[in-house]
């Protein structure tokens, strides 16, 4: 009997073993289609999630738990005593992905890093104009062209960056998605074949997943990269099910059609907490939701008009209606858990009467006509876009301002807003590394007006100098003073209507392990498993 039982147990074990060892696909319900996969051209979080977060790697990355920059493709780096030279030592034997459209002949080397940055920095580089009208928004807004004097190859596995001036934010900047490292060999192949646009549709990186197929507004399929240099993913395939409606994303995860649902509505989060088949991952987000007021459009060029608009908007009702009172009311450009946040600044007090009086003082006693731009579908930074826009529209009507709500598809909205076509724009920003400059340079510098992501389109020499001063030294006290003074200008000029510091959340099936929502809106599926 003992032998029979043992044999039966062994047989069962053999039958069960493949099931235990076998990895499974992971389907993620995402909110919209990426702009493409050539991440340096774009600044949307959706595009970063679909490209930089899964296909590529950067020289260094940001450890969210430890709150510090850590090695990635570079396993170490040195900084000269004057803060002007950074030398990165590349990890050996890192392979670029092998696909049916490219087979690399060598591993990652210094030429790849030099190509990646020269493409963005040098207008004589043949790849510089490939980005077209979109340019390189992050590189431009962060001022890298002015900051970086030269990028050069020391040897096959060593790269040197020479700066024109010390910059405390340089290494953190390299954690951002736009700093993903590209294959120079693949770029040369495409250039010779006159197929440069393939870089945006057929990406090659060093990351854990590689693109298999993409159907716009429907699905992105990734295979696991078998040559990945880091820990191998615990899933065998990754699928992005593009699902713009947050309510539909919630329905899909309840039905088991996806294992992770990103950017749920606050009410869906509350419902999921009561559902034993689901889990909720939450974190205070390093994000800010806001309405940008285009200072290059009349009468929004008048600071009194912008202040009146701030006074006219009932943000308490907005918080309740759009965010179900989750998150924290916003006052300054970045969240209060950020060092240098100025707690002495108070939000504009809601008062239609005071707003109307100030508008009259500005020369508009009968109001004016304007537009409010908003995306059609919800996200963590705007769960119910149209409802929020209609609340602002109704409040502005009380002071005589006639605002037309324009619901514009996300890709078109970003494109036209970067050209400054909007009046008032519901927008949001997710930081990448916890540094205040991650908001200040891309959203308020003069460089960012040129790149298009300073949506207030405000260029002021005083503010620009404070932003520059804030990153020219590593002294936290000096940086804090610069950023506090900058926040006062931003508030007094009423460049935004600050809305909410949201809570980042994601829903997962109960059988999913290893996934944590990022406060920065990034995604990491490398450690995720599906039981």
What are the residue ranges of the model-derived segments?
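Detector for C-terminal structural segments
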Residues: 24-30, 50, 168, 215, ...
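N-terminal lobe/hinge region of extracytoplasmic solute-binding protein
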Residues: 29-81, 118, 125, 202-206
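A structural "hinge/loop" feature
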Residues: 33-49, 73-74, 100-104, 168-180, ...
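Gly/Pro-rich hinge or "lid" segments in bacterial periplasmic/extracellular proteins
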Residues: 63-64, 146, 156-157, 166-233, ...
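Aromatic- and charge-enriched surface segment that lines or borders ligand/interaction sites
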Residues: 75-127, 160, 252, 299
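Surface-exposed binding/hinge segments that line
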Residues: 89, 121-187
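Extracellular/periplasmic solute-recognition and catalytic clefts
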Residues: 130, 212-226, 239-297, 316, ...
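Structural transition elements
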Residues: 209, 294, 329-362, 379-387
